[in-house]
From Swiss-Prot:
Its EC number is 3.1.-.-. This is Non-specific phospholipase C1. Coiled coil: none annotated. Residues 1-22 form the signal peptide. GO terms for biological process: phosphate-containing compound metabolic process. Belongs to the bacterial phospholipase C family. The keyword Hydrolase applies. Expressed in roots, leaves, stems, flowers and siliques.
Length: 533
C-alpha cells in the first residue's frame, strides 16, 4: 500500500512538473527588480506553542531574552487570594493532552475571567486548563530545557529570535494562519464551515507578488492549508503547489526556490510519516527534525546568500506565557466584526509565540524586541510578514489591510551587515531521541484543526455537496483522514492541470461533484469540472 502511494505521488509529480513548465512559460512576466540583499524568503508556521513553553528557559544562558526566571506562577483560582499557585517548570517533555485555545479559553487565560476591560494579567492559564482536565495546569505551566530542543537552541544562538512576536488574534489556528499571508481573517474568530467551503476571499500577499511579477510557491506534505484562500484555488496558481518530498530539496539545490516560499508540515500523524507540526499530542522531536531538514536544505542552496527563513507558530496552543498580550492601539484590519456571541473587534492580539529570523545577513545571537514603528503601538505579529515582504521586495501594491500597514517590520535587520556571513553552520544538531514514549496513534479521532482540513479537502473534491458533509471528519481516524486529504489534493490538482491543458480560463476554479472525483483525462471532457465562483 505504501509503495503504491509513493508510486502514485511520483506519477503525479511528473505530470505536474511537465504541465507547470509549459504553463509558467506562457505566463512569464517582466522581472521585478528587488533592491535589497534578500531575494527569497521562506516561511514556516508551526503549531500551538507559546514562547515561554518553547524558548522561555533560554534566558538562563541568554539574559537579554525576555524569558522565564522560575518565579512566574498562576493561581488555580484567580478569584481566591489564598489559592494554590502553579509555578513554571523546566520539565516539559511530551504533552499528550491538547490545552484550550478557543477564543473564550484564551480570554480567560489572558484576563483571568470573561471581563476584558482590565489589564491582561496573564494569570488564568492554570485555572482555565484545570477546568478542562485535573492536572493539566502543570503541563500548561511547563517549558522545555534548551538542551531538549537542540535545533531551536542552535538557531537562537546562531541567528535571530524575536521575544515580542504575538499571534495576530486571541483565538485558534486558522484565523491566525490567515493573518500570516493576508493580514486579516476576514472576520473569522473561529471556524465557520460555510466559509471554509467557499474559501476566504481577501487579497493575499500571494496576489501582491503575482501583480508585481514575482514568484511564490507552496511546498506541502499532507494538504496545503493555504487552499483555504479562495484565490489560490484558481487554475493559474495550481502550478505553484509542490510536493515537499519531491520538489523542495530539488528546487533548493537548483537555485529555483520562488521569491516567497511557504513550507507546510505534515498535519496527520501516522506510523510511516509522523506529524511534524508540533501540535499536541504530536512529537516535538519530529518538529525539530523537520526544521533541521528545512534549514540544512536552504543552507546548501546556491540561493542561501540572498535568502531569509522565518519560523513562527500560529498561536500559543493554551500554554503559559508571562508577557502581557497587547490590547491597546491594535487596528481592526478591514472593519469587519466577528460573529455572535462575541462580536470580536479584532482590536487586540493573541499570546506571544516563538519566532526565528534566520539568514546569513543576521548577526549571531540577535534578539529582536519591540519594533520601532510605524506607530507608537505597533507590534511584531503575523501581519509583519506581508508588511515586511512588501518592503523587502519593494512591491508597488498597497498594503493588504490596516493591520499590515500598522505592524512592525524587520527588513532593517538585513541591512546591518555589508556582506553575508561566511560562518553559518552547515548542519544543526542531531535529534536522536523521540520525546513521545509511543508511536503514532493512527486510530485516534481527528483534532479540531484536522477536521477543518478534512472539510477543506471535501470542498476540493465536491464532497461538501453530500448530505453527510456536516459530519465529515468527525468519525474518521487519523489514518483515514490522512488518506482522504492526500487523495483529495491529488484529484483536485489533476483535474486542474487537465483543465488547463484543455484550454480553460486560468482565472477559474475547478469545481467537482462527488460523482466526478475519479481521475479523468482531458479527452473525457474536463471542462465539466470548471466553474467560476
Amino acid at each position: 500500500m505504501a509503495f503504491r502511494r509513493v508510486l502514485t505521488t511520483v506519477i503525479l509529480f511528473c505530470y505536474l512538473l511537465i504541465s507547470s513548465q509549459s504553463i509558467e512559460f506562457k505566463n512569464s512576466q517582466k522581472p521585478h527588480k528587488i533592491q535589497g540583499p534578500i531575494k527569497t524568503i521562506v516561511v514556516v508556521v508551526m503549531e500551538n506553542r507559546s514562547f515561554d513553553h518553547i524558548l522561555g528557559w533560554l534566558k538562563s544562558t541568554r539574559p537579554e531574552i525576555d524569558g522565564l526566571t522560575g518565579k512566574e506562577s498562576n493561581p488555580l483560582n484567580v478569584s481566591d487570594p489564598n489559592s494554590k499557585k502553579i509555578f513554571v517548570s523546566d520539565d516539559a517533555v511530551f504533552v499528550d493532552m491538547d490545552p484550550g485555545h478557543s477564543f473564550q479559553a484564551i480570554r480567560e487565560q489572558i484576563f483571568g475571567s470573561n471581563d476584558t476591560s482590565g489589564d491582561p494579567k496573564m494569570n488564568g492559564f492554570a485555572q482555565q486548563s484545570e477546568s478542562m482536565e485535573p492536572g493539566m495546569a502543570k503541563n500548561v505551566m511547563s517549558g522545555f530545557k534548551p538542551e531538549v530542543l537542540p535545533v531551536y537552541t542552535e538557531l537562537a544562538n546562531e541567528f535571530g529570535v524575536f521575544d515580542r512576536w504575538f499571534a495576530s488574534v486571541p483565538t485558534s489556528t486558522q484565523p491566525n494562519r490567515f493573518y500570516v499571508h493576508s493580514a486579516t481573517s476576514h472576520g473569522c474568530s473561529s471556524n465557520v464551515k460555510k466559509d471554509l467551503v467557499k474559501g476566504f476571499p481577501q487579497k493575499t500577499i500571494f496576489d501582491s507578488l503575482d501583480e508585481n511579477g514575482l514568484s511564490f510557491g507552496i511546498y506541502y506534505q499532507n494538504i496545503p492549508a493555504t487552499f483555504f484562500f479562495k484565490s489560490l484555488r484558481r487554475l493559474k496558481h495550481l502550478v505553484k503547489f509542490h510536493s515537499y518530498a519531491l520538489k523542495f530539496k530539488l528546487d533548493a539545490k537548483l537555485g529555483k526556490l520562488p521569491n516567497y516560499s511557504v513550507v507546510e508540515q505534515r498535519y496527520f500523524d501516522i506510523d510511516l510519516f509522523p506529524a511534524n507540526d508540533d501540535h499536541p499530542s504530536h512529537d516535538v522531536a519530529a518538529g525539530q527534525r523537520f526544521v533541521k531538514e528545512v534549514y540544512e536544505t536552504l543552507r546548501s542552496s546556491p540561493q542561501w546568500k540572498e535568502m531569509a527563513l522565518l519560523i513562527t507558530y500560529d498561536e500559543h496552543g493554551g500554554f503559559y506565557d508571562h508577557v502581557p498580550t497587547p490590547v491597546k492601539g491594535v487596528p481592526n484590519p478591514d472593519g469587519i466584526i466577528g460573529p455572535d456571541p462575541f462580536y470580536f473587534g479584532f482590536d487586540r492580539l493573541g499570546v506571544r509565540v516563538p519566532t526565528f529570523l534566520i539568514s546569513p545577513w543576521i548577526e549571531k545571537g540577535t534578539v529582536i524586541h519591540e519594533p520601532e514603528g510605524p506607530t507608537p503601538h505597533s507590534q511584531f505579529e503575523h501581519s509583519s510578514i506581508p508588511a515586511t515582504v512588501k518592503k523587502l521586495f519593494n512591491l508597488k501594491s498597497h498594503f493588504l489591510t490596516k493591520r499590515d500597514a500598522w505592524a512592525g517590520t524587520f527588513e532593517k535587520y538585513f541591512r546591518i551587515r555589508d556582506s553575508p556571513r561566511q560562518d553559518c553552520p552547515e548542519k544543526l544538531p542531531e535529534v536522536k531521541l523521540s520525546l513521545r514514549p509511543w508511536g503514532a496513534k493512527e486510530d485516534s479521532k481527528l483534532s479540531e484543526f484536522q477536521v477543518e482540513l478534512i472539510q477543506l479537502a471535501s470542498q476540493l473534491v465536491g464532497d461538501h455537496l453530500l448530505n453527510s458533509y456536516p459530519d465529515i471528519g468527525k468519525n474518521m481516524t487519523v489514518s483515514e483522514g490522512n488518506k482522504y486529504a492526500e487523495d483529495a489534493v491529488q484529484k483536485f490538482l489533476e483535474a486542474g492541470m487537465a483543465a488547463l491543458e484543455a484550454g480553460a480560463d486560468e482565472n477559474t476554479i475547478v469545481t467537482m461533484r462527488p460523482s466526478l472525483t475519479t481521475r479523468t483525462s482531458p479527452s473525457e471532457g474536463t471542462n465539466k469540472y470548471i466553474g467560476s465562483y
